[in-house]
């Protein structure tokens, strides 16, 4: 895992920040070590309870990708396409 800050909104509650941080961690795991598709999609559903607008999701996703190199959008698309099993992007 690289050293960078997760994009967060300081107006969020602590609980909301934890939910969004869990999303960024799940994207990292999917790209580095892999994780179950259902766990990723559940984490995304929780993320959408905090980040409701697609515009905000895209903005945060871009900030995260610029910092980490991992794309929320591409990871989510792969999870939806795959549907089940272990989600693993990137090089083995």
UniProtKB/Swiss-Prot annotation:
Q: Name one Pfam family in it.
A: UPF0223
Q: Which InterPro entries match?
A: BH2638-like_sf, UPF0223
**Cysteine-cysteine disulfides:** none
Question: From the record, what ranges are coiled-coil?
Answer: none
Q: Which domain of life is it from?
A: Bacteria
Which segment of the chain is annotated as a signal peptide? none
Alphabetical list of NCBIfam families matching this protein:
PRK04387.1 (NF003353)
Q: What's the family?
A: Belongs to the UPF0223 family.
Protein name, UniProt field? UPF0223 protein EF_2462
What organism is the protein native to?
Enterococcus faecalis (strain ATCC 700802 / V583)
């Amino acid at each position: 895992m690289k050293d960078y800050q997760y994009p967060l909104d300081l107006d969020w509650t602590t609980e909301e920040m934890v939910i969004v941080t869990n999303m960024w961690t799940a994207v990292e795991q999917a790209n580095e070590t892999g994780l179950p598709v259902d766990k990723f999609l559940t984490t995304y559903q929780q993320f959408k309870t905090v980040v409701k607008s697609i515009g905000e999701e895209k903005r945060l996703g871009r900030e995260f990708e610029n910092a980490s190199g991992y794309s929320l959008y591409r990871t989510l698309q792969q999870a939806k396409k795959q549907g089940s099993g272990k989600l693993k992007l990137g090089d083995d």
